Swiss-Prot record:
GO terms for biological process, alphabetical: menaquinone biosynthetic process
Signal peptide: none
Residues reported to bind substrate: 53, 98-102, 110, 152-156, 179, 185, 282, 297
Protein name, entry field: 1,4-dihydroxy-2-naphthoyl-CoA synthase
Family to which this protein belongs: Belongs to the enoyl-CoA hydratase/isomerase family. MenB subfamily.
Sample GO molecular function, one term: 1,4-dihydroxy-2-naphthoyl-CoA synthase activity
Reactions accelerated catalytically: 2-succinylbenzoyl-CoA + H(+) = 1,4-dihydroxy-2-naphthoyl-CoA + H2O
Enzyme class: lyase
Gene3D superfamilies assigned to the protein according to its UniProt record, in alphabetical order: 2-enoyl-CoA Hydratase, Chain A, domain 1 (3.90.226.10), Lyase 2-enoyl-coa Hydratase, Chain A, domain 2 (1.10.12.10)
Enzyme Commission number(s): 4.1.3.36
Residues the UniProt record annotates as site (Important for catalysis): Y110, D180, Y282
Gene name, Swiss-Prot/TrEMBL: menB
Protein source organism: Mycolicibacterium smegmatis (strain ATCC 700084 / mc(2)155) (Mycobacterium smegmatis)
Entry keyword set: Lyase, Menaquinone biosynthesis
Amino acid sequence: MSSQAASDNPFDPAMWERVPGFDDLTDITYHRHVLDGARQPTVRVAFDRPEVRNAFRPHTVDELYRVLDHARMSSDVGVILLTGNGPSPKDGGWAFCSGGDQRIRGRTGYQYASGETAETVDPARAGRLHILEVQRLIRFMPKVVICLVNGWAAGGGHSLHVTCDLTLASREHARFKQTDADVGSFDGGFGSAYLARQTGQKFAREIFFLGRAYDAQTMHQMGAVNEVVDHADLEKAGLQYAAEINGKSPQAIRMLKFAFNLIDDGLVGQQVFAGEATRLAYMTDEAVEGRDAFLEKRDPDWSRFPRYF
């Protein structure tokens, strides 16, 4: 890596520490933000295959799901920054994620393989790529997921950025391209429907039908990017967003996320929102009275609880 490339790298190792218990990761890196020696409620999850534009294989997706689920279950984490490591050791190019690795895609889907070519495919394992489960995890977790697009966001990588709550993009290197129709694939779920919500139907259809590459500023104008940031400052900007979000009420943030989701997520969204509302109700004195009355085999006394209008 050249000194210029190193100086432009938005990742500053001094601001992060590896999350313990994940030393076996090969395709993903997982860090916790550290400020003045104190662990902060922000984590960084990054694709770590820069030599192939951070394309994912089944093993990559499994690791991604594992770390995201760990962040979801960590009560001291409020924001997840999702990005890609780089630059490429081959040509110095940058990528967030370029989608599925076409070299191990078979007729039954993306194959588990010991290597990176077709002859290393394990025929005994189903060609199942769990990227849709990852999308659902991002959508339904009660944490804010911010996508930091530092280079190419293509194909399945484009759909991941769409699924995240917020997107910040590198002014110099971010490129957005929906390649599905170029490789005989299509995202008929979150990657297309939510994109149409963000950009409108006409732009979303243009992005998918034409498969053109767009820079960060164009995507910002379309409505799919929140802010365009100088490349070297991308992760600093992400941390600033995270700090502001983590400075808000955790319960309010999770309810707001599920409220925004509800209009598009049907009965599933209603169930998620209702579950959170029920959990809030359990915290009230009124709910405690109902529980205690049941356990004590008496009629509940609701007289001290006003019927608000």
